[in-house]
UniProtKB/Swiss-Prot annotation:
It comes from the Eukaryota. Pfam families: CAP18_C, Cathelicidins. This is Cathelicidin antimicrobial peptide. The lineage of its organism: Eukaryota, Metazoa, Chordata, Craniata, Vertebrata. Gene3D superfamilies: 3.10.450.10. Disulfide bonds join 86-97, 108-125. Antimicrobial protein that is an integral component of the innate immune system. Binds to bacterial lipopolysaccharides (LPS). Acts via neutrophil N-formyl peptide receptors to enhance the release of CXCL2. Postsecretory processing generates multiple cathelicidin antimicrobial peptides with various lengths which act as a topical antimicrobial defense in sweat on skin. The unprocessed precursor form, cathelicidin antimicrobial peptide, inhibits the growth of Gram-negative E.coli and E.aerogenes with efficiencies comparable to that of the mature peptide LL-37 (in vitro). Keywords: Antibiotic, Antimicrobial, Cleavage on pair of basic residues, Disulfide bond, Immunity, Innate immunity, Secreted, Signal. Residues 31-131 form a propeptide. It comes from Trachypithecus cristatus (Silvered leaf-monkey).
């Protein structure tokens, strides 16, 4: 009879331990941020540390690179932010702020950790000069096309003058 008395108690403890075993991994998974959430948290940190007058808001998030499954390993990120009309001292979220017309655009690169408990990032943002790079590419290509065109014109002038000189028949 003693065995039967402890039997149901042991069964209940087994059930409790089984349920705890199922719940614990869910709690761990809940602490992992998505790629975009990690970037937005990093952006909050950037806004807090910024000496600029206004908040920055995410303008463009580059596609997520292929990553390993370890949330504690730093993940590479790259994104573009733009200055908003909201002052840094506001209590508003940057996502609730409109972009400032002709606001400063910055290109940010670095790493984030997806583990919410660690909440770590290493991001640097610089003024976005990609527009100027595209403009430079435009002028370089235009120069090449003009150069080829002038070379063709020069060849035609040379051919024209060559045809004007009377040829002597031998």
């Amino acid at each position: 009879m003693k065995t039967q008395r402890h039997g149901p108690s042991l069964g209940r403890w087994s059930l409790v331990l089984l349920l705890l075993g199922l719940v614990m991994p869910l709690a761990i998974v809940a602490q992992v941020l998505s790629y975009q959430e990690a970037v937005l948290r990093a952006l909050d940190g950037i806004n807090q540390r910024s000496s600029d007058a206004n908040l920055y808001r995410l303008l463009d998030l580059d596609p997520r690179p292929t990553m390993d499954g370890d949330p504690d390993t730093p993940k590479p990120v790259s994104f573009t932010v733009k200055e908003t009309v909201c002052p840094r001292t506001t209590q508003k979220s940057p996502q609730d702020c409109d972009f400032k017309e002709d606001g400063l655009v910055k290109r940010c690169v670095g790493t984030v950790i997806l583990n919410q408990a660690r909440d770590s990032f290493d991001i640097s943002c610089d003024k976005d000069n990609r527009r100027f790079a595209r403009l430079g590419n435009f002028f370089r290509k235009a120069k090449e096309k003009i150069g080829r065109g002038l070379k063709k014109i020069g060849q035609k002038i040379k051919d024209f003058w060559g045809n004007l000189v009377p040829r002597t028949e031998s």
